């Protein structure tokens, strides 16, 4: 373990501000109104307001990583007679398919491949051919490749066919402007340690209240019962059913203040976009190629092909960058040798410039 503070160029956990870290220096009692009403309830309200100005939505916080909340939604929103169409083009869509299988949830997996944008016409055809499908689930920002998926077009299909729409917006909510009511999203899932720039420890769901109220008695899990967690927070003014991750919650409350101070989601999106564009331009100038075409990229993380030089080893490249204070991500695409660089968190233009200089220095195979 080291005390050195690296710049994390990952899709989360990510580099957080000093003030977000300092917010965790306070110990809270989970029974206190100062915490439950003064912090948790304020967070719930702010999340709902970030998601939409429309009435009829609520939010619920859930201990654990983002995957816990995805599993909670799938396990609570779908009844025994329901069936979900899961749109998958990466590891996180595939994880939803795995969850559905383990829970015995009827599902149709539409896997369009890791580097392909989901075909909206193909989704339309699946819905038209199978009226037993009641729900659609998909990932917005698929960090396996850095692809941004067409949740607006699929949302229009969900609305037209009258399907419940579940969106994993883990690596996009708070960093990409969206109105979940306009997108016809019934359940949006995200996490504390992504674009809002908090630390790991809990995830959250912003849901259409009418849909969430109908989940009573459906959950396939005690601790991942989304309805029960929501009712506990509603009835007890922010109280969690089981131990609340108090320090993470305090950090998140501070992160929300810093999001507002930056200028909100639109301003943060602009910074992320500029980071990503500068990164791609600089990497191409160094001879690297992106896995995806530019029009498919999200402003969150970018996958680059590994150099073809036989001397290149990711582990050595990674080590040399880490020595200079930068941490990047290995590849996750099964069919391509690549690595990934994220640009969310407390990362600014000067950091991208410094990273590119460090990468040039770390390119030992060109020496």
Curated annotation (Swiss-Prot):
InterPro entries linked to this entry: Aminotrans_V_dom, NH2EtPonate_pyrv_transaminase, PyrdxlP-dep_Trfase, PyrdxlP-dep_Trfase_major, PyrdxlP-dep_Trfase_small, SP_NH2Trfase/AEP_transaminase
Reactions listed under catalytic activity: (2-aminoethyl)phosphonate + pyruvate = phosphonoacetaldehyde + L-alanine
Pfam (any one): Aminotran_5
In-chain residues carrying the UniProt-annotated modification N6-(pyridoxal phosphate)lysine: 194
Record key words, sorted: Aminotransferase, Pyridoxal phosphate, Pyruvate, Transferase
Cofactor(s) in the UniProt record: pyridoxal 5'-phosphate
EC number of the protein: 2.6.1.37
One term of GO molecular function: 2-aminoethylphosphonate-pyruvate transaminase activity
Keyword Chaperone: no
Domain of life: Bacteria
Example GO biological process: organic phosphonate catabolic process
Signal peptide range: none
Functional summary from the UniProt entry: Involved in phosphonate degradation.
Subunit structure and binding partners: Homodimer.
Similarity-based family: Belongs to the class-V pyridoxal-phosphate-dependent aminotransferase family. PhnW subfamily.
Protein name as catalogued: 2-aminoethylphosphonate--pyruvate transaminase
Organism: Salmonella paratyphi B (strain ATCC BAA-1250 / SPB7)
């Amino acid at each position: 373990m080291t005390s050195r503070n690296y710049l994390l160029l990952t899709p989360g956990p990510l580099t957080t501000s000093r003030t977000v870290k300092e917010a965790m220096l306070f110990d809270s009692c989970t029974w206190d109104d100062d915490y439950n009403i003064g912090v948790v309830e304020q967070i719930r309200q702010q999340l709902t307001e970030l998601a939409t100005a429309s009435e009829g939505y609520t939010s619920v916080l859930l201990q654990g990583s983002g995957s816990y909340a995805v599993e909670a939604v799938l396990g609570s929103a779908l009844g025994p007679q329901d069936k979900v169409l899961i749109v998958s083009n990466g590891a996180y869509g595939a994880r939803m398919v795995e969850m559905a299988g383990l829970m015995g949830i009827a599902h149709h997996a539409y896997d369009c491949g890791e580097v392909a944008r989901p075909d909206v016409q193909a989704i339309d055809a699946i819905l038209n051919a199978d009226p037993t499908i009641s729900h659609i689930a998909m990932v917005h920002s698929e960090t396996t490749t850095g692809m941004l998926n067409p949740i607006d077009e699929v949302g229009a299909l969900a609305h037209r066919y009258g399907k419940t729409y579940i969106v994993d917006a883990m690596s996009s909510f708070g960093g990409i402007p969206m109105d979940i009511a306009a997108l016809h999203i019934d359940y949006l899932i995200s996490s504390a340690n992504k674009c809002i720039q908090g630390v790991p420890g809990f995830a959250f769901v912003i849901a259409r209240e009418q849909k969430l109220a109908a989940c009573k008695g459906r959950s396939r899990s005690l601790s991942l019962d989304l309805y029960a967690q929501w009712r506990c927070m509603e009835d007890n003014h922010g109280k969690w059913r089981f131990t609340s991750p108090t320090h993470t919650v305090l950090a998140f409350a501070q992160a929300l203040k810093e999001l507002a101070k930056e200028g909100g989601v639109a301003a943060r999106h602009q910074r992320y976009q500029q980071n990503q564009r500068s990164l791609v331009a600089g990497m191409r100038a160094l001879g690297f190629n992106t896995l995806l075409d530019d029009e498919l990229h999200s402003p969150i993380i970018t996958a680059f092909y590994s150099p073809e030089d036989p001397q290149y080893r990711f582990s050595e490249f990674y080590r040399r960058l880490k020595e200079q204070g930068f941490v990047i991500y290995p590849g996750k695409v099964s069919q391509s040798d690549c690595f990934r660089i994220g640009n969310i968190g407390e990362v600014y233009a000067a950091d991208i410039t410094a990273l590119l200089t460090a990468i040039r220095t770390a390119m030992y195979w060109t020496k």
